[in-house]
Amino acid sequence: SFIKRRTMRKTYFYAKKKHVSNRFLQFMARRNNVIVMDLHNELKESIQKMAEVLKRGRNIIIFPEGTRTKDGMIGDFKKTFAILSAELNVPIVPVAISGAFEALPTGKHLPKLFSKINVKFLQPVYPTGHTYESLSEVVKSRIKHSLKIV
């Protein structure tokens, strides 16, 4: 799947500080709409930055598990995305990704050549009538259903 350039300019990513550790990566993050968070010191500030981005009508890509899978299975979802969606009344567009673990297993630094990764954008989930927990569960359920995981 490709995202149009115009959409990408309005799209932000959420990344842990440990992944943006050197000056070059920090420079690239600033130039490419990456909101960097420090789990120990700046969590509240980074959530506020994401809220401001959403209030301006922009998009944020958040990986709800907060990390890569260690075994190829879907892990527990963090609630940050559900809180932002519910508090700001913005929809969530779940994305089902398959083949990423096979292409780059835990502990590897280079992907396997010619690996196929499928990305599927699912129907939006609207926060109305949901708690943070139920919103998170609906999103997870739709992704699992799309990936044919029981």
Question: Where do the PLM segments sit?
Answer:
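Catalytic core of membrane glycerolipid acyltransferases/transacylases, capturing the structured
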Residues: S1-N41, K49
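Non-catalytic C-terminal accessory region of glycerolipid acyltransferases
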Residues: E45-V150
